[in-house]
Regions:
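Phosphate-coordinating catalytic segments in nucleotide- and nucleic-acid-processing enzymes
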Residues: 1-169, 199, 239
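Switch/communication elements of ASCE P-loop NTPase nucleotide-binding domains
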Residues: 130-239
């Protein structure tokens, strides 16, 4: 766990709350790259659960807003800022669809993840009151995310953000992109991240996986080769 020194006790430490740490990292990244970026996008470690339950979470927030001052609600923790931003982005995904279709290189990375990881497509369809339904479609049929594997539900938010939101010079922050992925699939995720970097996206990741870290390190070493040499070793010019 990340720690900070307590001013009252020179040699003692106390843990930094996870939400505060995330806010600090995001603020540092935005301050550092702010002059070069269009928008920062953050994919929290809890992205799978939030995406599966986004309707219930948004509905609860709307209900509390419309009944404020009329009903008393039990005290519950507020969403951290980055989680609230993630939820807002999910709700507005369909509205951004047309604008981001022109960014071909980045949506192509979303298609790469669908081809090599999810083995099916992630769709957005207008639901009741035009609230988006997020669905998974493969050869067996069409399913809501809560009926898919943990791997699909973890990768789905990445696919959606790449297809509809992230653009060149954006900052994309992903917590634990290797979560619920087999080592071979971790390699494919690392490949996707490299493709994003080559498309002009600034990517910041946190990871607990030595295997995933090693894959990224291999790609850094690979970047020292010429494009011709990379292709001769079985890699594309985007790797």
């Amino acid at each position: 766990a990340s720690m900070r020194r307590s001013p009252a006790h020179g040699s003692s430490f106390r843990p930094i709350h996870h939400g505060l740490l995330v806010e600090m990292v995001e603020r540092f990244a935005v301050d550092a790259y702010g002059g070069f970026l269009l928008d920062p996008y953050y994919l929290p470690a809890a992205r799978s659960g939030i995406l599966q339950n986004h309707k219930a979470l948004a509905g609860s927030a709307v209900s509390r807003a419309t009944m404020a001052g009329i009903r008393e609600f039990p005290q519950i923790p507020l969403f951290p800022g980055v989680v609230a931003d993630f939820l807002r982005n999910v709700i507005e995904l369909d509205r951004n669809q047309t604008a981001s279709k022109r960014l071909e290189r980045i949506p192509s990375v979303a298609s790469f993840l669908e081809e090599h990881l999810t083995k099916g497509e992630i769709h957005i369809e207008a639901g009741k009151m035009e609230y988006p339904d997020i669905l998974y479609k493969n050869q067996s049929g069409t399913f809501s995310l809560h009926r898919t594997s943990s791997m699909v539900s973890e990768v789905a938010p990445v696919v959606l953000f790449l297809r509809y939101l992230v653009g060149p010079r954006s900052l994309l922050i992903i917590e634990e992109p290797e979560s619920h992925l087999h080592p071979e699939n971790q390699r494919q995720m690392a490949t996707a991240i490299v493709k994003l970097v080559r498309a002009g996206v600034k990517v910041l990741v946190t990871t607990h996986s030595d295997y995933f870290f090693q894959q990224l390190n291999n790609f850094i070493m690979l970047s020292q080769l010429t494009e011709k040499d990379r292709v001769s070793h079985g890699y594309s010019h985007d790797d």
